[in-house]
Amino acid sequence: SSAASDVYKRQVFARSHAAPTTSPWTRELRERWELMKNDLGDIEIFGENLYAIHSIEYRKLETHFYVFAVRCLDQWLSWEEVKFYAALFDLPTVPELRVETVEGLTREALQQQVVSLAQEPGVFGTRDPQTGADCTREGVVTRNIGEYPVSEFARNVFKYVRKGHVKTDEHWTRNWKRARLIWEIRKEE
């Protein structure tokens, strides 16, 4: 599992914009922000921060932060623009599972596709940290490929999270561990 983070000119935030994050698992991201902040302008970059392991351990991470959205003022940018800005700041985007038109797609067919995708192994080598066994991906995010106003977010994005992906009985932040990158894992094998 992961923690969403927002990087923009004022600070780095984790999920909420109530206060900037100072957690130890966002240190690397905050250091990166220091290098980028003067170039962001009105751009806000949103992504998954996979630095800390919690409900899923990823075994094929090349880096710890993956961009999933970019906002400029009151607009969420198109997926093409997200990829452009991510590349501009040398940040990877989250993996694309499918890009297709939804014209004529029924709610039932979309639900079946999303549930099917969620039952597959994750692109980043998903593993249950408690058992060490491989597991399916945490879920699937579906978004409109075009740009849309911030006020229309709920009509353009949805996230499906599989039942039971969180198995810890205590909050992961108490005894967190850093997620190793793929080259670190290969070096140990």
Residue ranges of model-derived segments:
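Conserved, well-structured core segments that form or line functional sites
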Residues: H64-L105
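Short, small-residue-biased leader/transition segments that mark boundaries at the very start
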Residues: S2-Y8
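Charged, compositionally biased interaction regions
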Residues: L91-E189
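Conserved loop->alpha-helix
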Residues: K9-A52
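Short glycine/proline-enriched turns and hinge-like loops at secondary-structure junctions
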Residues: S1, Y58-E62, C135, S151-A154
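Short, glycine-/Ser/Thr-/acidic-enriched flexible segments
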Residues: H17-A19, L50-A52, C72-L73, G146-E147, ...
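Short His-Asn-centered micro-motif
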Residues: A14-R15, F46-L50, F68, V99-E100, ...
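Ordered, amphipathic secondary-structure segments that act as subunit-interaction surfaces
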Residues: E44-Q75
